[in-house]
């Protein structure tokens, strides 16, 4: 098996840049770009297979096939990406879901084991209720990966993902932050990665609870929390109840999950959106289920959102999922957030209309400062979580942190 080498470890972290038309369906297209930009997939291979994916079943078979081919050709980095993301469109009850999640992650930790064996990246498991939250911890590096001798970090960052994340996907962003002088604790919480897929712990909207567990375990204070995607709601939520968080980066506009869900399935602000919201509020379970079923039959993104949502949030049907999502919001606790906050949006986000930022700005009345940065397609960063230009995004986040810390002096 191909192994990562010491020479590879001392190279500076680099990011790919660009967005490609790989599939006519917006969510398949985005996830294929994510596969290339973040996960290590080969662009030329994906360009060939992308147009042949029309259903979730196509996605599964094509990506497993690509993973098998990559393994046969000893292209382990590509195989990790294909196996890991093959699981993405597998649904609850599919025995291959856990199988390929574990296959991809086991390959990941074997392929990059030198990072861990050398001590450059430390792993820990934080007790949380009946499970353990996995954490990767890295201290600041000088350029090319040599750890600084006793140098104080520019800041301590608590980093996590969102609704469908695997924290291994943020491995190289974590290293990039460390390479630039930051100490980083990257963790998975309930509903994410192996905490849900292997340990069986599903989401909680009370994100301050897993965050408290991590802060307590490592005795952290005065940290910056960065939450990606749904983390754009979860991280501010945690900050509302946790004074040890001094700065908040919401790496997605995310005022209210129910509104985001209905925007994606019914269209933002449309008659159908308003009707669906009213039906949910009136507890019209059978009608809501019918509406979502009809939508899911025609739209693979709605199908994925619904199936993943029922699985991740332990809902028995569409109504249960959609109604539960009203608890996943920041608007009802926004007045408790008093820290500096940066909200990051994208002008072509296929999940979240960037116009939703107004709700957040109006609700965050007591923050110390509020910065909003809208990335655009002209910067190759207009898609969800700006995955087409990660370097630009992380450089922006780091600069903001340093500005906020400088203002505190």
Regions found by a protein language model. Name each.
Residues 177-194:
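Conserved alpha/beta-hydrolase
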Residues 337-338, 343-345, 349:
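Short beta-strand/loop motif that positions the catalytic acidic residue
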Residues 241-322, 345:
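Hydrolase active-site cap/lid region
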Residues 173, 339, 353-363:
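Short alpha-helix in the alpha/beta-hydrolase fold that links the catalytic acid
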Residues 169, 200-220:
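Alpha/beta-hydrolase active-site loop
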Residues 163-175:
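The serine-hydrolase catalytic nucleophile loop
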Residues 56, 63, 99-149:
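N-terminal cap/lid segment of alpha/beta-hydrolase-fold proteins
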Residues 376-391:
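Catalytic histidine-centered segment of alpha/beta-hydrolase-like enzymes
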């Amino acid at each position: 098996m191909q192994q990562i080498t010491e020479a590879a470890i001392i190279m500076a972290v680099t990011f790919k840049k660009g967005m490609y038309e790989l599939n006519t369906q917006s969510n398949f297209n985005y996830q294929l770009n994510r596969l290339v930009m973040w996960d290590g997939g080969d662009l030329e291979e994906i360009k060939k297979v992308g147009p042949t994916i029309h259903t979730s079943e196509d996605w599964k078979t094509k990506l497993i096939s690509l993973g098998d081919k990559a393994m046969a050709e000893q292209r382990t980095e590509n195989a990790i990406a294909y196996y890991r993301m093959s699981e993405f469109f597998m649904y609850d009850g599919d025995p291959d879901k856990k199988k390929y999640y574990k296959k991809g992650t086991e390959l990941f930790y074997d392929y990059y084991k030198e990072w861990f064996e050398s001590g450059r990246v430390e792993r820990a498991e934080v007790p949380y209720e009946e499970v353990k939250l996995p954490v990767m911890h890295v201290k600041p590096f000088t350029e090319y990966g040599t750890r600084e001798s006793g140098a104080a970090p520019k800041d301590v960052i608590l980093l996590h993902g969102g609704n469908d994340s695997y924290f291994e996907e943020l491995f190289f962003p974590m290293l990039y932050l460390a390479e630039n002088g930051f100490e980083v604790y990257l963790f998975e919480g309930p509903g994410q990665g192996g905490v849900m897929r292997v340990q069986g712990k599903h989401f909680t909207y009370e994100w301050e609870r897993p965050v408290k567990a991590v802060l307590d375990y490592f005795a952290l204070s005065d940290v910056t929390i960065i939450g990606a995607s749904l983390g754009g709601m979860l991280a501010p939520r945690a900050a509302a109840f946790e004074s040890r968080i001094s700065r908040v980066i919401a790496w997605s506009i995310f005022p209210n999950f129910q509104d985001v869900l209905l925007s994606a399935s019914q269209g933002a602000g449309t008659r159908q959106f308003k009707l669906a919201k009213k039906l949910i509020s009136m507890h019209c379970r059978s009608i809501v289920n019918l509406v979502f079923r009809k939508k899911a039959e025609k739209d693979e993104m709605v199908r994925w959102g619904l199936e993943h949502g029922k699985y991740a949030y332990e809902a028995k049907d569409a109504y249960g999922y959609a109604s539960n999502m009203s608890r996943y919001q920041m608007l009802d606790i926004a007045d408790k957030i008093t820290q500096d906050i940066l909200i990051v949006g994208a002008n072509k986000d296929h999940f979240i209309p960037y116009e939703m930022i107004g709700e957040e700005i109006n609700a965050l009345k007591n923050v110390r400062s509020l910065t909003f940065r809208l990335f655009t397609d002209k910067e190759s960063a207009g898609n969800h979580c700006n995955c087409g230009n990660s370097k630009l995004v992380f450089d922006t986040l780091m600069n903001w942190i340093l500005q906020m810390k400088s203002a505190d002096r």
